[in-house]
């Protein structure tokens, strides 16, 4: 049905992508939205993008787990725990393997997420061009098709999202 497919404009954007599209989700264990990318929830998270994968089956998706100072903490800790102690506590509470998490130093060596306030964020990469796809502090939290397609269009054309109306 029409509800289960992408709009014609989104299909055009995906159709113009003849190279590899990679989406990396950076999950900060100490961010309030860390739960979105937890391993137990990855399949549910991937459903957000299943319509895109249908049109771009070679789309690569990766999850990178780390801990660092968040803009909005996952919880307010009483006491004076260090960031590492907070991370270890969250790993224990959520039954997560500590080996899967990069330290603040390790994540910073890989990518600078300070401009994203160390929040859960997705990075779309296409033909060497990268753009971020964010989650939101509203009732919906997750990006809609329009926002996902705008980010893809930005990766494809390296233009502002305002130009998306000019999809050819």
Question: For each predicted feature, which ranges?
Answer:
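Short, surface-exposed patches at the edges or C-terminal ends of soluble domains, predominantly
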Residues: 1-168
């Amino acid at each position: 049905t029409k509800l289960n497919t992408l709009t014609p404009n989104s299909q055009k954007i995906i159709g113009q992508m003849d190279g590899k599209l990679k989406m990396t989700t950076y999950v900060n264990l100490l961010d309030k939205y860390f739960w979105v990318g937890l391993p137990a929830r990855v399949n549910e998270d991937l459903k957000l993008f299943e319509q895109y994968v249908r049109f771009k089956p070679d789309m690569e998706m990766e999850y990178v787990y780390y801990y660092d100072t968040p803009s909005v903490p996952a919880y307010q800790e009483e006491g004076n725990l260090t960031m590492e102690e907070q991370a270890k506590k969250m790993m224990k509470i959520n039954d997560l393997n500590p080996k899967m998490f990069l330290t603040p130093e390790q994540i910073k060596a890989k990518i600078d997420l300070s401009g994203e306030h160390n929040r859960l964020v997705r990075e779309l990469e296409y033909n060497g061009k990268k753009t971020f796809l964010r989650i939101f502090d509203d009732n919906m939290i997750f990006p809609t098709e329009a926002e996902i397609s705008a980010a893809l269009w930005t990766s494809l054309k390296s233009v502002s999202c305002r130009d998306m109306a000019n999809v050819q």
